[in-house]
């Protein structure tokens, strides 16, 4: 009797534990999908990484979270990461995927694990870029993906102002740089809005916004948002599948308990009939009291077993109901998140439109007030850019223009004849 009660409770506990483990593995898988786009980036000194490690233990059917290893780590001057247990791990020149793979392999060998731990490595902070030369504020600046020379110069306040005679020309250059950054950001926001509307409308593809049909590189932005939408869709499906599997397990348990209850009910019926017959014989003095007591005990045991089955069945039904509610909540939360993201994107677009209008007004004013600024197109050849980049451990200077991509650790040199007048 006690054994059956414990088994009922244990089954319910295992179902809840199963759902928790599945949710954790889904989170790690989603994190791994988000890293796929950063795999081509090669790590370097001063890059900061966020490491998370978990291990699926096949024998126990559970997930172990290696919190002692998880955390933020910086690639040191030697080009290595220093992790607990693992020690120094070469990282410079490798991708995040390669580092994650090595962490899993080393931990498996170090601890003699049967299952290889799953490591998730993502960029927490890129190493900075540096501005030098004729920049308003030279120095160190944080790197951001898709950074170009023009955007980097804008971070440094644009070209240096030399005197009042060049003020309007400088205003034009600064406003032009800010406008270029704002136009690029507007394109990203328009594509993001199109992706959110597609997700809300349950569409499989993202239509190109009308405003961007003739914009260069719009297809790249669309491909990036499409990859993100597919990743998010897969994550939601994994979570829903986990809940569906849990409900299926609980339903199977409920059906098994129902069959067991039918069997026990039949046993109770037979035991009751035997007890009644013995009672009748005992009244006539034809049956032993010991046999009567034995049958009474049998009836009581079967009744207790039926009670345990009913309790376990009720618990399984409650868990199934909770899993169904969790599925509904997941869908509702997903829809609410999409609506909130769309609202935030619309607000950012409105703010950016105002900023873009201000930048264009400043450019117009500079052109009207200054002949230097009005002739800036002809004078643009006097502004030169170059990038000093480490190649094979040696600094190499390469020619650049405003649209040249910048990599983490680059030094951007700006030279302009206009600033020397």
UniProtKB/Swiss-Prot annotation:
Keywords: Exopolysaccharide synthesis, Periplasm, Plasmid, Signal
InterPro entries recorded: Poly_export, Poly_export_N, Soluble_ligand-bd
GO molecular function: polysaccharide transmembrane transporter activity
Signal sequence residues: 1-31
One Pfam family matching this protein: Poly_export
Pathway connected to this protein: Glycan metabolism; exopolysaccharide biosynthesis
Gene Ontology biological process terms in this record: polysaccharide biosynthetic process
Cellular compartment(s): Periplasm
Gene3D superfamilies on file: wza like domain
PANTHER family: POLYSACCHARIDE EXPORT PROTEIN GFCE-RELATED
Annotated protein name in UniProt: Exopolysaccharide production protein ExoF
Gene that specifies this protein: exoF
